[in-house]
Design a protein with these regions (language model features):
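Mature, structured domains of secreted/extracytosolic soluble proteins
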Residues: 5-7, 15, 19-170
């Protein structure tokens, strides 16, 4: 009987841990990643924390610290200044698509579009998803591309796909 109760306790503990892990929202998942400290700082500076903690669902193409490092010197520091909040907000919301598009859904959209899928960001901009050399490529309005390096980081209010470059609106 003690073994059954102990086994039941372990089972409930495992379920609780999985349930708590799934309760992390987009911001919490990004904040837990050492590769996304710049993104999290930018989200805070833009005042988007509460929005991205909202119900959603959202699909976020999340640039890494290295992606931000590819921008011209001083760009990140300039964007984080309070007087540039509008520009920063525009760039960050350009990385967010309404709805939860996991890798399977993105792949299906690319296939249905004959090799390309147009995604509309919450900022109203357009991104183009395609596949190149077996990797999903996201192209911004200026023709710059980012590749998805990790897909389907699930959150309670959406999904994150890690990308290797910052996307820029027109």
């Amino acid at each position: 009987m003690k073994k059954i109760i102990a086994g039941l306790f372990v089972f409930v503990a495992v379920l609780s841990t999985k349930a708590n892990a799934q309760q992390k929202d987009i911001v919490d998942v990004a904040a837990g990643s050492p590769a996304h400290t710049t993104l999290v700082a930018a989200v805070k500076a833009a005042g988007l924390v509460e929005t991205l903690k909202g119900k959603g669902p959202f699909t976020v193409f999340a640039p890494t610290n290295d992606a931000f490092g590819k921008l011209p010197a001083g760009t990140v520091e300039t964007l984080l200044k309070p007087e540039n909040k509008g520009m920063l907000t525009g760039i960050l919301t350009y990385h967010v698509v309404a709805g939860k598009l996991d890798a399977k859904a993105v792949g299906a959209a690319i296939k249905a579009g004959g090799g390309k899928a147009e995604l509309t960001t919450v900022a109203g901009g357009k991104l183009t998803a395609s596949v190149e050399n077996g990797k999903v490529k996201i192209t911004d309005a200026k023709g710059n591309s980012a590749y998805v390096t990790a897909a389907d980081l699930n959150a309670s209010n959406g999904v994150i796909h890690v990308i290797d470059s910052v996307l820029l609106p027109k």
